[in-house]
């Protein structure tokens, strides 16, 4: 039974998240329905990351097993045709046959995320579902300085959801950079894995630094508190993009 790796792009605005759920449409469910329409097979696909409602992806990775072999470009194009027919905001960017031991989630060695903030007085029209609108000037250099306190191996209890199901709050952040281009501020994060709501918690707290409400050292103090109450407000989902997975 051949195994295929799919690289997936999606607009998460109208989905309950990546994972199949009973309370609304999911990205996983949309792809599984497309596979069923194409092949007649009921499959369960596994993604590299379980993005929340409203979170987007430009490089989510998933795998699935099919009973017959497919030319990979045919599989990609056929799935995209079925997704388009169902008016899904999901696109298969690439399909590749992989060894049976490949696992989209557990074989990953690094995940890359981007959080976008647009800092300007005027509300967003075109970018309203793809960035966090902050109607004031932010000091991105102070935000970047603060972010470096979060790089490395730490207990991130402060920056994970109270509903996080991970066994341990310990994670290693390889990269957390804040840059600015005009009115766009980008927060780029890299790690092998992240905790639930971790990046959005980072972004919300870094915004406080950018506003001057916190100093960079205040972020370090929040980290060391190991207390969810020490976290700033969680940033909204629309600014978060799952960019890439390394294997």
UniProtKB/Swiss-Prot annotation:
Please write the reaction equations for the catalytic activity of this protein. uridine(38/39/40) in tRNA = pseudouridine(38/39/40) in tRNA
EC number of this enzyme: 5.4.99.12
Signal peptide: which range, if any? none
Listed InterPro entries: PsdUridine_synth_cat_dom_sf, PsdUridine_synth_TruA, PsdUridine_synth_TruA_a/b_dom, PsdUridine_synth_TruA_C, TruA/RsuA/RluB/E/F_N
CDD domains per record: PseudoU_synth_EcTruA (cd02570)
Instruction: Name the positions where substrate binds.
Output: 113
Name the domain of life this protein comes from: Bacteria
Keyword tRNA processing belongs to the record = yes
Task: Please give the SUPFAM superfamilies that the UniProt record associates with this protein.
Answer: Pseudouridine synthase (SSF55120)
- Which UniProt key words apply to this protein? Isomerase, tRNA processing
Q: Which GO terms describe its biological process?
A: tRNA pseudouridine synthesis
Keyword 4Fe-4S: yes or no?
A: no
Q: Which residues form a coiled coil?
A: none
List the GO molecular function terms: RNA binding; tRNA pseudouridine(38-40) synthase activity
In Pfam terms, one family for this protein is PseudoU_synth_1
State the active site.
Answer: 52
Q: What is its biological role?
A: Formation of pseudouridine at positions 38, 39 and 40 in the anticodon stem and loop of transfer RNAs.
By its UniProt entry, which NCBIfam families does this protein fall under? hisT_truA
PANTHER family per record: PSEUDOURIDYLATE SYNTHASE, TRNA PSEUDOURIDINE SYNTHASE-LIKE 1
The similarity comment for this entry is: Belongs to the tRNA pseudouridine synthase TruA family.
SUBUNIT field: Homodimer.
| Protein's UniProt name | tRNA pseudouridine synthase A
Q: State the species of origin.
A: Sinorhizobium fredii (strain NBRC 101917 / NGR234)
């Amino acid at each position: 039974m051949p195994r295929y790796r799919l690289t997936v792009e999606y607009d998460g605005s109208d989905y309950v998240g990546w994972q199949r759920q009973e309370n609304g449409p999911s990205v996983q469910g949309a792809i599984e329905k497309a596979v069923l329409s194409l092949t007649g097979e009921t499959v369960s696909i596994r993604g590299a990351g379980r993005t929340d409602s409203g979170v987007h992806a430009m490089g989510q990775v998933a795998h699935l097993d099919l009973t017959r072999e497919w030319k990979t470009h045919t599989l990609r194009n056929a799935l995209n045709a079925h997704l388009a027919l169902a008016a899904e905001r999901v696109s298969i960017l690439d399909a590749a046959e992989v060894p049976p031991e490949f696992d989209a989630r557990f074989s990953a060695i690094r995940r890359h995320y981007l959080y976008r903030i647009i800092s300007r007085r005027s509300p967003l029209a075109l970018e309203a579902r793809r960035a966090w609108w902050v109607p004031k000037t932010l000091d991105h250099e102070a935000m970047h300085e603060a972010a470096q306190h979060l790089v490395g191996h730490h207990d991130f209890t402060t920056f994970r959801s109270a509903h996080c199901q991970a066994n341990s709050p310990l994670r290693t952040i390889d990269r957390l950079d804040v840059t600015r281009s005009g009115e766009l501020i980008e927060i780029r994060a890299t790690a092998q894995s992240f905790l639930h709501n971790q990046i959005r918690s980072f972004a919300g707290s870094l915004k406080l630094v950018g506003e001057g409400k916190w100093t960079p050292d205040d972020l370090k103090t929040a980290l060391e508190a190991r207390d969810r109450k020490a976290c700033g407000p969680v940033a909204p989902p629309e600014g978060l993009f799952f960019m890439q997975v390394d294997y």
